[in-house]
From Swiss-Prot:
Gene: mdh
Keyword NAD (UniProt): yes
HAMAP family in alphabetical order: Malate_dehydrog_1 (MF_01516)
Annotated protein name in UniProt: Malate dehydrogenase
Organism: Edwardsiella ictaluri (strain 93-146)
One example of a Gene Ontology biological process annotation: malate metabolic process
């Protein structure tokens, strides 16, 4: 199994690469790419960690040496949020980066499963889909927006509030991956009941958790460590599924059946070829139903922005 990380010299990329070096199955290959010249050095640094995972690193404009033979490509390249920016402010810079990198993936490793971490995910995934489509290699079962950070934050915040071990929780989060489009299904936690006020406050905190980190870092960056952990969790689940484990389920942002929007985050059954089945979002509470209906216009606009970036 070969996993490539594009954007590997950044805060998320380095955290993700460290976790993959220590947790990928023995015999795996980890391939790191970043435009920054430090990237081969990051690979050398990681290579000293005693696990049976081979690491190589590539810098410069051309990502293709890192992509040859990749089974999974994780993309965290781009600029990070600073105070006062929201994820959509990142669009102007990051859209061009994703267009370029996905073009290289389409040429070099067209059959790889792709996980988009770069924000705004709501818009970057449609950009990736349109680039792959133009290249004639788009497979909707192999393109994922990584929304796992919303799930782990939900687990953490509910665990804190209810004095539970967050590792025992797995709260589904649907919709998208910014602001109001993030909808944690807090009515679906077995054995945990929350008041209306708790639900409203938790939902808001989960939706705004990224801003909480940006402000706490006081201009020094955005969420890199928790995002690295979230991306590693998603990637390792995908690796397990691709190697034949059954019943591997993670939430992710994928091309959907179109009931709510062209792309939608929901629980996914993963398998050897990527996405096997979009699972039901279950029965929503009245609060969740209202939140879902009121976010869809925002989500659809985010998606259209990405489509238009490539097609206009």
């Amino acid at each position: 199994m070969k996993v490539a990380v594009l954007g590997a010299a950044g805060g998320i990329g380095q955290a993700l690469a460290l976790l993959l070096k220590t947790q990928l199955p023995s015999g795996s290959e980890l391939s790191l790419y970043d435009i920054a010249p430090v990237t081969p050095g990051v690979a050398v640094d990681l290579s000293h960690i005693p696990t049976a995972v081979k690491v190589c690193g590539f810098g410069g404009e051309d990502a293709s040496p890192a992509l040859v033979g990749a089974d999974i490509v994780l993309i965290s390249a781009g600029v990070a949020r600073k105070p006062g920016m929201d994820r959509s402010d990142l669009f102007n810079v990051n859209a061009g980066i994703i267009r370029n990198l996905i073009g290289q993936v389409a040429r070099t490793s067209p059959n790889a499963c792709i996980g988009i971490i770069t924000n705004p995910v709501n818009t970057m995934v449609p950009i990736a889909a349109e680039v792959l489509k133009k290249a004639g290699v788009y497979n909707p079962n192999k393109l994922f927006g990584v929304t796992t950070l919303d799930i782990i934050r939900s687990n953490t915040f509910v665990g804190e509030l209810k004095h539970l071990d967050p590792a025992t929780l797995d709260i589904p989060v649907i919709g998208g991956h910014s602001g109001v489009t993030i909808l944690p299904l807090l009515s679906q936690i077995p054995g945990v009941s929350l008041s209306e006020r708790e639900v409203a406050e938790l939902t808001k905190r989960i939706q705004n958790a990224g801003t909480e980190v940006v402000e706490a870092k006081a201009g020094g960056g955005s969420a890199t460590l928790a995002m690295g952990q979230a991306a590693a969790r998603f990637a390792l689940s995908l690796v397990r599924a691709m190697q034949g484990d059954e019943n591997v389920v993670e939430c992710g942002y994928v091309e959907s059946d179109g009931e709510y929007a062209r792309f939608f985050a929901q629980p996914l059954l993963l398998g050897k070829a990527g996405l096997v089945q979009r699972l039901s979002i279950g029965t929503l509470s009245a609060f969740e139903q209202d939140a879902l209906e009121s976010m869809l216009e925002v989500l659809r606009k985010d998606i259209a922005l990405g489509e238009d970036f490539i097609n206009k």
